[in-house]
Amino acid sequence: MGTVKITSRYGILLGFIALLCTIISTGIFFLTKDKIDAVIAAQQRELLLQVIPQDYFNNNLLESAVIPQDKNFVGIQKIYFAKKDGNISAYAYETTAPDGYSGDIRLLVGLDPKGEVLGVRVIEHHETPGLGDKIERRISNWILGFTNQSINEHNLSEWAVKKDGGKFDQFSGATITPRAVVNQTKRSALIMLNNQALLQQLSTQVK
């Protein structure tokens, strides 16, 4: 009988401790949530500024994003609309190259409405360290090769790695990774050029 009482007391005590830990954890979460959200937003803004220069827009890019549902935007997860005095001046696409050497490569591609690439950055990848990871800006300047490059119906063949007859460098021992990034950047630009009317409609959903 005494054993039952002791066990019961320990059970109540452990339950109380668990409840107290939950309350403390919840309190810490709510106290730090705003700070965490602010840090994430700052990182997102910094990344967007790497693909769309500040002088292109005076709206809030983070509040000007749309998740496209139309089948014409396959492979595009999100579109940020850069506006200058209410007029569209550029786009940033969150897009995914499905054919990296080690799987998906998530990209952020900045474009102006005429087909000029303003910048490209890698958001996430799983490519081989020392080979495919040269697509990262912190490791090499390769990704900067897209900046100010234009795409149109007359130069589509140039939008490939040199091994495939294009103008973009591949990496020694790693052609698949840069090929995937070049091809997805090209696809993103063509989606933008071929869907101007749809983009105008989508832009009405944001500030």
Curated annotation (Swiss-Prot):
Alphabetical list of InterPro entries matching this protein: FMN-bd, Ion_transpt_RnfG/RsxG
Bilayer topology: Single-pass membrane protein
NCBIfam families: PRK01908.1, rnfG
Function: Part of a membrane-bound complex that couples electron transfer with translocation of ions across the membrane.
RNA-binding in keyword set: no
First-level EC class: translocase
Predominant place of localization: membrane
Modified residues (FMN phosphoryl threonine): T175
Name of the protein in question: Ion-translocating oxidoreductase complex subunit G
Record keywords: Cell inner membrane, Cell membrane, Electron transport, Flavoprotein, FMN, Membrane, Phosphoprotein, Translocase, Transmembrane, Transmembrane helix, Transport
GN (gene name): rnfG
